[in-house]
Curated annotation (Swiss-Prot):
NCBIfam families: PRK04184.1, top6b. This is Type 2 DNA topoisomerase 6 subunit B. ATP binds at residues 48, 80, 101-102, 111-118, 475. Keywords: ATP-binding, DNA-binding, Isomerase, Nucleotide-binding, Topoisomerase. SUPFAM superfamilies: ATPase domain of HSP90 chaperone/DNA topoisomerase II/histidine kinase, Ribosomal protein S5 domain 2-like. Relaxes both positive and negative superturns and exhibits a strong decatenase activity. It catalyses: ATP-dependent breakage, passage and rejoining of double-stranded DNA. It holds the Pfam family HATPase_c. GO terms for biological process: DNA topological change. The keyword ATP-binding applies. Belongs to the TOP6B family. It comes from Thermococcus sibiricus (strain DSM 12597 / MM 739).
Length: 566
């Protein structure tokens, strides 16, 4: 009876693919709401284009076109001059989730999960029923035209039709065409136009063209010919890993011993550190064997203070025996490392001291390029920026914060906070983002901005990391990590001080202009009076007074400008 009931219960048991999961939960990828869904779709395609161009060393040219086909029904076209996609990878790139060139690597990139563009293809498929048309070539081969969809049950790309065309001109790049329904184009601060505008600011080396549904062409011209240096893959840091990381990496490594595996595949681990690790694991094993709670607490205190050799010595022969056992772990093949041993390694790492992880692999926008981007797109009267030194969060994940500030000029009244992660604009979920809280918690009145919400002020904040701590798979909000919050706050205060100095100089200049006009107003009257008293010609006296005023205010102007430039 029990068996038959169990059979009935498990009759509907089904293994769900990752594609099927995200088909049912598209909101987790950012496809929620008509406006946001369209922006997310464009974001995924443009991000792919920029990353591909930069990795291939090509200055990006990206063209986006939205054609209205009906009510809440659009055709989306995104074309780039990137390296193109080899024929055998087309189905995987556009039709298989959790597949890509970057998701498995510890490297800074705009996309992190290997879901992006395949998620867009799936969204087009489930809203319009149409496959996505891909036209691509690597330049040296034929042009491939393929209609791609996703088999959601298998999480596999499916090519419905494929045509090969001759390529006499050597065209190279990728063009994506997809039909989507249940979306809406609106020119708002969460729409496609604003997204592309913000993308152009943070990527001044990119040329971006946009054709709106009404046919209007908008061009965000390239303002820098300097291609960003490609980011470097970085080894994981001992303070930023979990047991599963070590265990899985140990199963895949080609290294012959646990010692060489740890030294070769993690940063800041040397032979000396391995010897230290052996001592910490030994000390932890011995402490766990101790039955008396008071003694155990005293030993843990000594462990925290780094007195591992004294702890081992206090156990006499038992300590030496455990030390020999742990040393053997370091010399065995990594594939034979047990889960418990991996746990011991991670636990020991927590008590050890390591140099901060190397940060050479991070690639910020850079102060000069931030200022070029803000100036070229926003045309302010004042612009400044700061790139903070690299730091780490969660003990071992490197990150860097940079902030740009633009004020006045063609900026309209109203504070604009431009949030970015690895150069990618974050348009949604601002309330839960650490960038918002850090920027808003500044007392702007201290920096001569009396009402920040009405000031013609734009603040760009970019968080750079090999692993940005997003709050969700939609990747629109950065989690509130204490170290990141503090770095943003310090960077914002830095540029705010520069703004205050500029505004102070501007106010003094206006005051001096007012004083000069007042003095000049009295020149004719004073000239007449002095002429009567001295007998000198009135015109000559007037000329002398004007010269005195000019010299006086010329020196004041120079002093104010020098202070503003400092």
């Amino acid at each position: 009876m029990a068996n038959s009931e169990a059979d009935k219960l498990f009759k509907e048991f089904k293994i769900q693919s990752v594609s099927e999961f995200f088909r049912r939960n598209a909101a987790m990828l950012g496809y929620t709401g008509k406006l946001r869904s369209l922006t997310t779709l464009i974001h995924e395609a443009v991000t792919n284009s920029l990353d591909a161009c930069e990795e291939a060393g090509i200055l990006p040219y990206v063209r986006v076109e939205i054609e209205e086909l009906g009510t809440e029904h659009y055709k989306i076209i995104v074309e780039d001059n990137g390296p193109g996609i080899p024929e055998k990878f087309i189905a995987h790139v556009f039709g298989k989730m959790l597949a890509g060139t970057k998701a498995h690597r510890n490297i800074q990139s705009r996309g992190q999960q290997g879901i992006g563009i395949s998620g867009a293809v799936m969204f087009a498929q489930i809203t319009s029923g149409k496959a996505t048309r891909i036209i691509t070539s690597t330049g040296e081969e034929e042009i491939i035209e393929a209609w791609v969809g996703i088999d959601v049950d298998k999480n596999e790309g499916k090519i419905f039709k494929k045509i090969k065309h001759p390529n006499p001109t050597g065209w190279r790049g990728t063009r994506i065409e997809m039909e989507v329904k249940d979306v809406r184009y609106i020119r708002s601060k969460q729409g496609v136009y604003w997204y592309l505008k913000l993308t152009a600011i943070a990527n001044p080396h990119a040329h971006i063209e946009f054709i709106e549904p009404d046919g209007k062409l908008i061009v965000f011209s390239r303002s820098s010919e300097e291609l960003p240096e490609p980011p470097e893959e970085m080894k994981p840091h001992p303070k930023g890993i979990i047991t599963d990381d070590i265990y899985r990496m140990a199963q895949r490594t080609t290294r012959t011993t646990v010692r060489t595996f740890l030294i070769g595949e993690f940063s800041r681990i040397s032979d000396k550190k391995i010897d230290e690790l052996v001592q910490y694991i030994t000390a932890l094993r011995l402490i766990k064997e101790e039955e008396e709670q008071n003694v155990k607490e005293q030993l843990m205190k000594r462990l925290v203070d780094g007195e591992v050799d004294k702890i081992i010595a206090s156990f006499g022969k038992r300590g030496k025996k455990v030390l020999r056992e742990v040393r053997k772990i370091m010399e065995k093949p990594p594939k034979k490392l047990t889960w418990h041993e991996a746990e011991e390694i991670v636990e020991a790492f927590k008590y050890m001291t390591f140099l901060a992880p190397p940060t050479h692999g991070l690639r910020p926008i850079g102060e000069e390029n931030i200022e070029k981007g803000l100036t070229g797109i926003l045309r302010p009267e004042f612009v400044t920026s700061v790139t903070r030194p690299p730091k780490v969060y969660r003990g071992g994940i490197p990150f860097q914060v940079e902030v740009g500030l633009a004020f006045g000029g063609e900026l309209s009244s109203g504070f604009d906070l431009l949030r970015y992660a690895n150069r990618v604009p974050l348009l949604f979920d601002a309330g839960s983002c650490v960038i918002t809280s850090a920027a808003r918690n500044i007392d702007w009145k201290r920096y001569r901005v009396d009402d920040v919400d009405r000031a013609p002020l734009a603040l760009l904040v970019n968080v750079v990391s090999v692993h940005v701590p997003y709050t969700s798979t939609g990747k629109q909000s950065v989690a509130n990590e204490e170290e990141i919050y503090e770095e943003i706050r310090l960077a914002v205060m830095d540029v705010a001080r520069r703004l205050a100095k500029y505004l102070g100089g501007k106010h003094r200049k206006l005051y001096q202009v007012k004083r000069r006009k007042t003095l000049e107003k009295y020149v004719p009257e004073v000239s007449r009076a002095l002429s009567i008293l001295t007998g000198l010609p009135e015109g000559e006296i007037k000329k002398m007074l004007v010269t005195i005023i000019e010299k006086k205010f010329e020196s004041i102007d120079e002093a104010v400008e020098a202070e503003s430039d400092a």
